[in-house]
């Protein structure tokens, strides 16, 4: 018995730091082992590609909270990973984590990769996280994709800063649930 314990302890010491880092205790507590292994494989892929992992973890935890079956959780995590990859393609390898997350959400909200790239080109200093988040919020609030994009892109072309984008969102979001915002 003592020999088994020593071998197990030695095995733990030999595990790579990357393998240990890949394990998220939140996932261990909420997912079955098969689902967790597949989600952790997606996390490892994201890390290897320099993509943020927290959106993947959050999607897995969301699925677990809703009682989704393991394969559905894995599919949802894979979709988020694919969105982050598309965001990276649209923004380039130098994109910051917050920009990738915002771009992935904007893509899910109806933006195209070319729209994301355009935003990078026209936004002062190339910072796109806030403009893309505002676009996503407007679409989620009921504004049509085209109208929301025109509003955000126009402000970007005019050199709007983050505060201006947040004011745009406040101005264009519906005043009450169910009402539809209008484009300027």
Label for each model-derived stretch:
Residues 21-184:
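General marker for long, soluble alpha-helical cores
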Residues 1-4:
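Positively charged n-region of N-terminal signal peptides that target proteins for export
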